[in-house]
Amino acid sequence: PASFVPGRNALFLSTAASYAYNRDVQDLVGGMCQTDYSGYPDCRRVFIDSMETSISLAMDMDVRIHTPLMYLTKAETWKLAKDLGEVAGQDVFETVRIESHTDYNGNRSQWNEWGYGKLDNPASKLRAEGYKEAKEKGWI
């Protein structure tokens, strides 16, 4: 899509690592997944591994980048959110559905049962299709 920012996850991970360094935190968590790879090379595991190595070398400490969604389909990600139930008094599924944002065109005005966005970009289409599949399988 036109709004795709090449290498954005390199920027996010570098920024997070700099912030974490000053707090003596060595574990970073990212929501990247290879299901997003079609057109998004910075969502691949090989990229994340290279960033883990580069950040560790740049900061002279062992940094670990955890990507719990890496090998899940979008439907499985919705299922995971549902299965997590409540955390710290918050319904994880509802928090993901309402507060997370996937639309690459920044649309937050159109509400759908899968969250905010329009189906005019690949990211929203993947999210909506995953939601539909999870619903059809009775996971959510």
Region roles according to the model:
Residues 1-140:
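Nucleotide-activated chemistry modules centered on ATP-dependent adenylation/adenylyltransferase
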